[in-house]
């Protein structure tokens, strides 16, 4: 019997796993050194006790209504005023929504080294159910994880709906702000279509498991629940790079779920900042056939593959992949490697992955949000004890997303799971200190599941939601009537008429879209 635990993540420079497989007992030995601060444990215990329908807000507050739940933004202490100006369109839009009943819009500054508890205390709040009159429920972090750490984001996300944006230029911030506001203000809607993309590379237990036991059943469950949606599944041989290119270009759904390895690179590799977290597709022949061989970009989808003519506006994507959302400066799992006892540096600095940044700030209108993983993604997200499928967290969150809930509220299911696992892990560790026996397999499972649950983040405004109507993939077109005068004695070739009319209809539709885009461009230049 193979009792090895396999870890996600492929070293794209060597074609090998970033971390070799371990036995449960080896992993349990590592978990025994884990500690959870008492103040954080108290909040985890509170979060575990909360009923799911209350989400993170206090009783009587509708988390789907920004006028009740509130919205705030958190800038780094040294943020340039020009950054605020770049986001002005989004900030003014959210302020108008959050202040409809009471003043529930806030702008904050994060101080270096500040913990979540210190931040809340300084702003008049504390642990527990969110009171939007003190600190809004929806919070958007603006800045890179060196200035506002990932650890602060994950702590804050236990009770609040937190998202982050970080771009390289103010123009990209402005582009994202414009994309969100136009999706919510304009007559904008997408067809109710979702796509599920599941890679299963040869000789690779990780992706074979995620394709068969995460992507496939999740797509089936969603399809059974939402009969007014169209669900397309691309599994195994269908999960190629060319297919993903199509899904992120001219076949873009409203919601996209992918599961694959994320590409990892050694510190110092010139590709790390640009391509870490890129999605390795079915084109890769697996860790046996490709052992010792660098993975070429023809086998993975990176930021460079996002074309300028891609149609991404309104998309919400969920990438289950290592480093899919970002990379920390220090490896949280470096002690999984032989003879390593301390965390070591894996990147020059913590950073947000380039692929989702490119999707969010696309010049033709970007994605509204991308859900992904900071550091490694683990199979324990959907398998318990490596055998029992546990899809309820994914299923519940995706149901809320497809129902039109704000993405931050939908992800509360993941936050609740993290809190529950943290409490369980703390209990097991306490029993160990008291000399009680704890099963090694159980401890290993809880430890990996806890670390995995902590890593899910939202890139984008946590208050965005899908804009769908089920009828068309474009805003409704305003068409003038067209009259064709055909003499009654004209001789028509009926067998050619249908094809001719269809071609004419397509040309008229394309012209109408072009004219509408031109009107919008002229309007923007005038304003």
Question: Where do the PLM segments sit?
Answer:
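Short, low-complexity, charged amphipathic interaction modules
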Residues: 484-527
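A domain-level signal for caspase-like cysteine endopeptidase catalytic cores
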Residues: 22, 26-34, 39-42, 49-51, ...
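Catalytic-core segments of thiol-dependent peptidases
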Residues: 77-78, 94-98, 125-146, 218-353, ...
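Intrinsically disordered, low-structural-confidence terminal and linker regions
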Residues: 1-29
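Active-site-proximal C-terminal subdomain of hydrolase catalytic domains
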Residues: 194-205, 213, 217, 221-224, ...
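Beta-sheet entry/capping signal
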Residues: 71-72, 137-140, 193-195, 253-255, ...
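Aromatic/His-enriched, Gly/Pro-containing loop or helix-boundary segments
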Residues: 104-129
């Amino acid at each position: 019997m193979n009792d090895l635990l396999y870890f996600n993540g492929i070293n794209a420079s060597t074609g090998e796993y970033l971390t070799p497989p371990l036995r449960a007992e080896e992993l349990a030995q590592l978990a025994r050194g884990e500690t959870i601060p008492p103040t954080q444990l108290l909040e985890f215990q509170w979060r575990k006790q909360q009923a799911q329908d209350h989400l993170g807000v206090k009783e009587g507050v509708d988390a789907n209504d920004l006028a009740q739940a509130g919205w705030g933004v958190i800038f780094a202490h040294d943020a340039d005023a020009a950054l605020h100006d770049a986001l002005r369109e989004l900030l003014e839009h959210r302020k108008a929504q959050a202040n409809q009943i009471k003043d529930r819009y806030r702008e904050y500054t994060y101080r270096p080294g500040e913990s979540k508890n210190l931040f809340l205390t300084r702003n008049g709040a504390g642990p527990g159910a969110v009171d939007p009159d003190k600190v809004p429920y929806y919070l958007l972090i603006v800045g890179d994880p060196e200035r506002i750490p990932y650890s602060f984001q994950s702590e804050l996300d236990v009770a609040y709906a937190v998202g982050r944006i970080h771009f390289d230029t103010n123009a990209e911030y402005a582009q994202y702000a414009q994309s969100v506001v136009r999706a919510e203000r304009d007559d904008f809607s997408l067809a109710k279509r979702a796509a599920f993309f599941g890679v299963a590379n040869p000789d690779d237990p990780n992706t074979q498991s995620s394709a068969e036991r995460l992507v496939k059943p999740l797509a089936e469950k969603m399809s059974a629940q939402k009969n007014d949606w169209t669900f397309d599944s691309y599994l195994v041989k269908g999960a190629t790079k060319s297919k993903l290119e199509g899904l992120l270009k001219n076949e873009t759904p409203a919601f996209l779920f992918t599961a694959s390895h994320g590409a990892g690179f050694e510190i110092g590799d010139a590709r790390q900042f640009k391509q870490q977290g890129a999605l390795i597709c079915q084109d890769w022949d697996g860790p046996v056939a490709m052992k010792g061989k660098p993975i070429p970009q023809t086998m993975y989808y990176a930021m460079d593959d996002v074309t300028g003519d891609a149609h991404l506006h309104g998309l919400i994507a969920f990438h289950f992949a290592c480093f899919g959302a970002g990379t920390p400066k220090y490896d949280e799992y470096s002690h999984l490697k032989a003879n390593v006892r301390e965390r070591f540096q894996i990147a020059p600095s913590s950073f947000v992955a380039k692929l989702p940044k490119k999707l969010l700030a696309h010049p033709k209108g970007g994605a509204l949000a991308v859900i992904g993983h900071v550091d490694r993604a683990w199979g324990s997200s959907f398998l318990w004890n490596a055998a029992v499928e546990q899809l309820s967290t994914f299923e519940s969150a995706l149901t809320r997303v497809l129902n039109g809930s704000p993405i931050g509220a939908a992800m509360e299911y993941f936050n609740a799971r993290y809190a529950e696992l943290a409490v369980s892990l703390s209990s097991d560790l306490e029993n160990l200190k008291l000399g009680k026996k704890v099963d090694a397999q159980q401890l290993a499972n809880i430890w990996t599941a806890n670390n995995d649950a902590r890593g899910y983040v939202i890139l984008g405004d946590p208050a965005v939601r899908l804009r769908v109507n089920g009828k068309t993939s474009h805003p409704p077109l305003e068409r003038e009537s067209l009259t064709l005068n055909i003499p009654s004695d004209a001789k028509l070739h009926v067998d050619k008429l249908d094809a001719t009319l269809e071609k004419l209809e397509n040309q008229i539709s394309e012209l109408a879209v072009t004219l509408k885009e031109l009107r919008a461009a002229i309007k923007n230049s005038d304003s």
